[in-house]
Amino acid sequence: MSAKILNFAGKHGTVTEIDFSRLELNLKAASDNFRYFRSLLEPRTKLLVLVKANAYGHGGVEFAAMMQRAGADYLAVAYPVEGLELRRNGISLPIIVLTAGNDFYPEIIRTRMEPSIPNLYSLQQLTEILRSQGLKDYPVHIKLDTGMHRLGFVRSELPALAEFLKTAPEVRVKSIFSHLCVADEPEQDDFTREQLALFESLSTSLSDAIGYRPMRHVLNSAGIERFPEYQYDMVRLGIGIYGISALPGKVLAPVASFKCKILQIKHLKEGDTVGYGRWGKARPGTVIATLPVGYADGIDRRLGRGAATFSVHGHRAPTIGNICMDMCMLDVTGIPCQVGDEVTIFGEDPKVSELADLLGTIPYEILASVPRRIHRLVVR
């Protein structure tokens, strides 16, 4: 992504800044988190890193390259277009496409990505295309439904699946996998253990029926931390690599820090109002700072009107007025700052989990909401 360049003026003069809003990706933090999760696994266990949804908002290409260097064994994306972008940018690791879509099989095959297969129809469509190209033993990953009830084969569908696989030399099952619903919720561990037991049963039955042993994987980030005895042959590391742990009190290093620069400082008089709807009300001596980020940049409108505070030189400054599409305002009264100074939206302080709590959501949503127009910068 090209850098944004803007001239902006304030009482301290005109400042020219490149990437006046950016998402910094801390390479050391990512490496530390990778080593932490790697330490929970047996040496033989492969580690797959999820880089779907633009790597949870962190920048798909940038983060995939970091994981390729860190030693990940596999990557996974949600849709083919995400994997194609990685391939175009030199990512050579095996890539599982979790939601392949029958229309995209030719591109998946051309770029040697590996589709997840959730139903027999998808497998039949893929096999026809492979047969037309004279290809054999193409790697596929069979998705089992053990309780999410979203995608995947259920027990009653396994006999037909096995029969088809035994007569389809065009494909070879590289792995059998499923997804845990509530591995991060201890109060629902009984259900998680039911899922794990069902996965063991279904995956064993399918392996026996096809006559060979594909890899198996079922653990997500929370599962790696809380149920490592079920690591099988591979695990899938998602939110954990980005700095969110499922364990109470376990603090991982946040990889992403959303930062921007102050565009303008304004000194208001009592009674002045701020922003759309005039929701911001100035007290005597109020000083506000305008920032170049708004709800189009992932700053939820519910964080306006003082609901959230961002960090300016180590001081917390509350929002004032409504969040705009491309800008928001902070009350920086009493905080020494000037045009061009740095503001942290989330990172070390405040943490992304704090904003998620304010919004009644999860850190995933906050991170994935940072759009591509915000430049990603890898910090070593």
Where are these regions (language model features)?
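Basic side chains
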Residues: 38, 52, 87, 143, ...
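Active-site-proximal beta-alpha core segment in soluble small-molecule metabolic enzymes
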Residues: 4, 8-9, 16-17, 21-32, ...
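Active-site anion/phosphate-binding pocket segments in diverse small-molecule metabolic enzymes
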Residues: 2-27, 31, 81-82, 101-103, ...
